[in-house]
């Protein structure tokens, strides 16, 4: 082995040592982070304020704390849960969404177990929530045990009186409801007759005007009437 090979090996070892030393955090800082992780092992996601507080206690940057928690949730947290007698694979640690989300939800739990607020039925639609699943034509049951929403029959939903009431409400609530209050359209045949009569009157008027104009051009101009002046004799003077 030559001296150059030895130099390269020493350089690699020195780089490896620097990398290892760069990744190691102070023991006091690690202890503070581990204590916080154990206290919040069911929801190990510190908030921004808690990250700043831990940064001041451990003299570490916020980025270092975030990276430490990412690795700790994969390596340290499963052992902590096993010591409590719980299987980490059956738990999904949820992010903190508020004070009510400090408890982890089991992975096998169904979202239908959560309380869902159902809005009050409106006057437009009527929905009935039933706990019994709907059956298909072949009698097969749906796989999902979610509560089914069944619409009422069309006869119960839409009646002539209810339709008129809905139209009246929609017309009264619309800001442009007055624009649609137009008289009913006339039948097409009546429109056609009126248009034909009007067109005939226009044609007659035009023809009459042309005849009068032609008659004026053909008639000669009337002669001018000259009244003779009275003759006065000289003897009368």
UniProtKB/Swiss-Prot annotation:
Span of the signal peptide: none
Gene3D superfamilies: Homeodomain-like
GO cellular component annotations of the record: centrosome; nucleoplasm
Region (Repressive function): 103-237
Modification note: The C-terminal part is phosphorylated in response to EGF signaling by the Ras/MAPK pathway.
GO molecular function, one term: sequence-specific double-stranded DNA binding
InterPro entries, sorted: HD, Homeodomain-like_sf, KN_HD, TALE_homeobox
Residue range(s) of DNA binding per entry: 16-79
Residues modified as Phosphothreonine: 182, 186
Subcellular localization, as worded in the UniProt entry: Nucleus
PROSITE patterns: HOMEOBOX_2
Keywords assigned: DNA-binding, Homeobox, Nucleus, Phosphoprotein, Transcription, Transcription regulation
UniProt keyword annotation of Signal present: no
CDD domains assigned: homeodomain (cd00086)
Transmembrane segments annotated in the record for this chain: none
GO biological process: amacrine cell differentiation; negative regulation of transcription by RNA polymerase II; neuron differentiation; nodal signaling pathway; positive regulation of amacrine cell differentiation; regulation of gastrulation; retina development in camera-type eye
Chain positions covered by the region annotation Disordered: 87-106, 171-196, 212-237
Family note: Belongs to the TALE/TGIF homeobox family.
Record note on quaternary structure: Interacts with the transcriptional modulator SMAD3 and the histone deacetylase HDAC1.
Its biological purpose: Transcriptional repressor, which probably repress transcription by binding directly the 5'-CTGTCAA-3' DNA sequence or by interacting with TGF-beta activated SMAD proteins. Probably represses transcription via the recruitment of histone deacetylase proteins.
Record protein name field: Homeobox protein TGIF2
Gene: Tgif2
């Amino acid at each position: 082995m030559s001296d150059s090979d030895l130099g390269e090996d020493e350089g690699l070892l020195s780089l490896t040592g620097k990398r290892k030393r760069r990744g190691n955090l102070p023991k006091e800082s690690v202890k503070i982070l581990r204590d916080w992780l154990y206290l919040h092992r069911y929801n190990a996601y510190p908030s921004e304020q808690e990250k700043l507080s831990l940064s001041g206690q451990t003299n570490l940057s916020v980025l270092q704390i975030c990276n430490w928690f990412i690795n700790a949730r994969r390596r340290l947290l499963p052992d902590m849960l096993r010591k409590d007698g719980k299987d980490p694979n059956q738990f999904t640690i949820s992010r903190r969404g508020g004070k009510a989300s400090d408890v982890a939800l089991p992975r096998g739990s169904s979202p239908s177990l959560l309380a869902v607020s159902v809005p009050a039925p409106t006057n437009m639609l009527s929905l009935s929530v039933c706990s019994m699943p709907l059956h298909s034509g072949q009698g097969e049951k749906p796989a999902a045990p979610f509560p089914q929403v069944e619409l009422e029959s069309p006869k119960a939903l839409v009646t002539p009186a209810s339709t008129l009431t809905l139209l009246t409400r929609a017309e009264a609530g619309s800001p442009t409801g007055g624009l649609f209050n137009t008289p009913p359209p006339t039948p097409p045949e009546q429109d056609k007759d009126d248009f034909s009569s009007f067109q005939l009157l226009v044609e007659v008027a035009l023809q009459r005007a042309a005849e009068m104009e032609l008659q004026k051009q053909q008639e000669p101009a009337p002669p001018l009437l000259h009244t003779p002046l009275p003759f006065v004799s000289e003897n009368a003077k």
